[in-house]
């Protein structure tokens, strides 16, 4: 299968997103995979747009009735959002472990597990509306303290809002806001 199927991380992010979402929110889901999170948020928010680099994922999300754009992170998106949710590729992956299938875009976080997360954090503030926030799923394997440092370096503030132990890792959802706004 070429699309990341909903799993423990998907459901943890979905639960946090449902708690965080407001009826007036314009929402962006980055890396939507199957489109489940966007589909579940659709009736709870003003608008939702999903994106994914994987053409198989965009097709799967579209089949769920989700408005989806094929894009590498924010490249295909203009505008600002009240809420941005992202379940990034966060698994540390050595070069010799990398595959060339589309599913690898959902899994391969680079050597540290933070390559895609770093790119996301660098551009995040430009896509948040005033008072906007993001929910970012990470793993204990990703180095949570390092992710929080990366957020600070991008003038963002990260706060843990959900976590769950799973097999060999702890999954966490960080709520991220611009450092120039109160939490």
Spans of model-derived segments:
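Flexible, glycine-/basic-rich loop-and-beta segments that form/coincide
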Residues: 180-183
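Conserved Class I SAM-dependent methyltransferase catalytic core
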Residues: 114-173
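Conserved SAM-binding loop
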Residues: 50, 109, 136
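Mobile active-site "lid"/loop adjacent to the S-adenosyl-L-methionine
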Residues: 88-116
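Glycine-rich, phosphate-binding/catalytic loops in enzymes
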Residues: 44, 100-104, 152-154
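Conserved SAM/SAH cofactor-binding pocket of Class I
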Residues: 8, 12-99
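Short beta-strand element of the conserved SAM-dependent methyltransferase core
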Residues: 107, 173-178
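Class I SAM-dependent methyltransferase Rossmann-like catalytic core
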Residues: 1-6
């Amino acid at each position: 299968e070429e699309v990341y199927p909903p799993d423990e991380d998907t459901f943890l992010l979905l639960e946090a997103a449902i708690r965080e979402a407001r009826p007036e929110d314009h929402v962006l889901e980055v890396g939507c995979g199957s489109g489940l999170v966007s589909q579940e948020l659709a009736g709870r928010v003003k608008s939702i747009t999903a994106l994914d680099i994987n053409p198989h994922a965009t097709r799967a999300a579209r089949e769920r009735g989700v408005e989806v754009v094929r894009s590498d992170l924010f490249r295909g998106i203009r505008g600002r959002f009240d809420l941005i949710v992202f379940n990034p590729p966060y698994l540390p992956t050595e070069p010799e472990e990398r595959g060339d299938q589309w599913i690898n875009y959902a899994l391969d976080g680079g050597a540290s597990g933070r390559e895609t997360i770093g790119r996301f954090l660098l551009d995040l503030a430009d896509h948040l509306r005033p008072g906007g926030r993001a929910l970012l799923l990470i793993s204990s394997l990703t180095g949570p303290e390092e992710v929080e440092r990366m957020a600070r370096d991008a003038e963002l503030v990260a706060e843990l809002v959900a976590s769950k132990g799973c097999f060999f890792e702890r999954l966490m959802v960080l709520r991220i806001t611009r450092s120039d706004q109160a939490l």
